[in-house]
Amino acid sequence: MFSLKQPKPSFRSYLLPPQQEDKLNPETKIKKLKAVLLPGEIVVNEVNFVRKCIASDTSQYDLWGKLICTNFKISFITENSVPFQRFHYKNLLLGEHDVPLTCIEQIVVVNDTKRKQKILSHNQKLKFNPTELIIYCKDFRILRFRFDEAGPESAKKVCLALAHYSQPTDLQLLFAFEYVAQMYHKPEYKVNGIDPGGGGDFCQRTPLFETYSDWDREIKRTGASDWRVCSVNEGYMISTCLPEYFVVPSSLADQDLKQYSHAFVGRRMPLWCWNHSNGSALVRMASIKDLLQQRKIGQRVCSGITRSHPLRSDVYKCDLDHNVPSIQDIQAAFSKLRQLCVNEPFDETEEKWLSSLENAQWLEFVRTFLKQAAELAYVLDFSRRSVVLQEEEGRDVSCLVASLVQLMLDPYFRTIVGFQSLIQKEWVMSAYPFLDRCNHLKRSEKESPLFVLFLDCVWQLLQQYPAAFQFTETYLTVLHDSTRISLFGTFLFNSPHQRVQQSTEFAIARNIQLGEEKGLKFPSVWDWSLQFSAKDRALFNNPLYIGKSVPCVQNGAVKSFKRTKNYSSTMRGMPPSVKNGMAIQQDFMPRRNSLILKLKPEILQQVPVIIPSSGFEQYLRDWFTKPADLHGVILPCLHGTHIKLWKLCYLRWTPEAQINHGGFITAFHKISLLASEIELLQSRLRQYRAYPLSTVTSPVGEQNRMFFRPDELHSSNGSLDILTSSFPFSPIGNLCRRSILGTPLSKFINGAKIWLSTETLANED
């Protein structure tokens, strides 16, 4: 019934590899395959002799194995290796062919004989035996499985189980609850040797803003001396949409806050976000629903914010409900982007691809939010006025805008720990509804990818100022993927109150003793050691970044974040006529591209020229004409092609979009080697100064900051073959497209020489 094909001769060798005798036949071997399960994870259903399709029109390279559905993931287990795949970064929670249930967007079953197909929903019946299963994922992957050799009833059961468990109707049915329950009942359970929610360098240093002290430290770090930490919402007595502790003007008493809270939507009072060194503050609040008291309460709140400013400057109000796209518009644009990136066949849509991308409006929305944040940065930095972000509920687009403003103005948030603390402060603790917006419970009417849009905006800044960020594009992509893993409490709830309430109810039902804890303790996504090894976590470190020590807090005051005029961090020795990508004069100094500029003078016309028709545009013009200090303010360039598509995130599973030995990773590889070698030399120099007469050796573990290191060049053969524009992700094995394997394009992608040389042509003659 079932047989595995013998390997065919490859292009490099016409000899079959030696076959080792195996006492177990292929059928028995597949039946004995077992899934690797986490604590609390159970196998719901499984089916043997499943074929995972590597491409849609050939079975030569397909994989045979077992398809397993658990309460956490869909897992395909095989003993075969994926063809042409030389590297795949390893997630310690998920196997190479695993997909979390919360990452599944749509399930389609097909019967070839009856020519039927159906989209499976929760608790639906299936009247035919499926011969094929297609899974559309939220990260733009498409997985295809064939049941030609599998039992028809087993195939039907696993499809129904997958539809049922991937579309839960209750929050407590998500896997994180079962995982944590096992941890509390059996403390000996650990994942990768680490307790849930603890461990990891970044996790230990990332403030979660769940305590009074975290907010107090942030006040002192920013020098907000006229602001105080308020505990009026302790126990969520005032609002379930606010954290227990938050920051308010010192002039507003707790009694005033209690009185004003009833007038705001969701009782979300003004919430302090950040303070500039000049005294201006960034504040968020919901709309005032009581129209009769709107003017009165608004004036009192603004008066309190004004008194907290050393210059007593007027408050600038920004109505985000009218200034930026709605969450519905953002969802519609993202749906068009997803359809464009997963559409097949790719070659038939290539001609109109760019116009379709423009019509999706996703990049235009990215530009809109970056521009809005830059305008508010101008108000805070140049006008020295406090800014109040007002939104209907104050917990959606205000999260995005507030985060971008702080990212542009404060270099601390461009470090890994600072960026994680920013997300904790402005998204998690400020009650951004991750449960609804990520659609973990399949309530599509509330879904909107605001957090994805935020990461995209951050990526745009990272591309424009690669030396200003401690983290890399890989870090942002992995963070994007982590929102689809239903294990971390970080992206699982609509608010901190919901986490406490739901976990407390679950603990009572499961007879879990919480003690003094407020609800169950879920693993934090910032504990990256739960997902990746120390080696893989090195991909998060940007070799271009030059860190700066955190400013010391003295009497509530910190050093200014202002840029210095004499420092250019974009390129040493850059001519004064070119600053921050802005051309000031026509007489360029000799550069590598000077010949191109002379041959094509029209290129100069593509350089963005800002007409100073307003204060903001004059501010931009002045900023772009000065050398940038990447430890100070950074502003986005919004013109022309400066806003790009985040290809690593959206097109990493599309083989037609890959560049073998190309993309930014090639430069990243060289820079990492150079940075690693510099660190090694510095380490040896420090050791020599300490022990000048001793033999200088390489300290173990001291030069591990970079993923690529000089000491591995000689030990790894063909290490450059793993470098593609989708690194460290591999599109092979995640396809639902016309096969390109064995074609000239396939050979080119895999490094083969497909063009004939002049010597070859001469010899043939």
UniProtKB/Swiss-Prot annotation:
InterPro entries with a match to the protein in the record: MTMR10_PH-GRAM (IPR036004), MTMR10_PTP (IPR030573), MTMR12-like_C (IPR022587), Myotubularin (IPR030564), Myotubularin-like_Pase_dom (IPR010569), PH-like_dom_sf (IPR011993), Prot-tyrosine_phosphatase-like (IPR029021)
Myotubularin phosphatase domain: residues covered: 209-650
Entry coiled-coil feature ranges: none
GO cellular component, one term: cytoplasm
Any one Gene Ontology BP term: phosphatidylinositol dephosphorylation
GO molecular function, one term: phosphatidylinositol-3-phosphate phosphatase activity
Family named by the database record: Belongs to the protein-tyrosine phosphatase family. Non-receptor class myotubularin subfamily.
Protein name per UniProt: Myotubularin-related protein 10-A
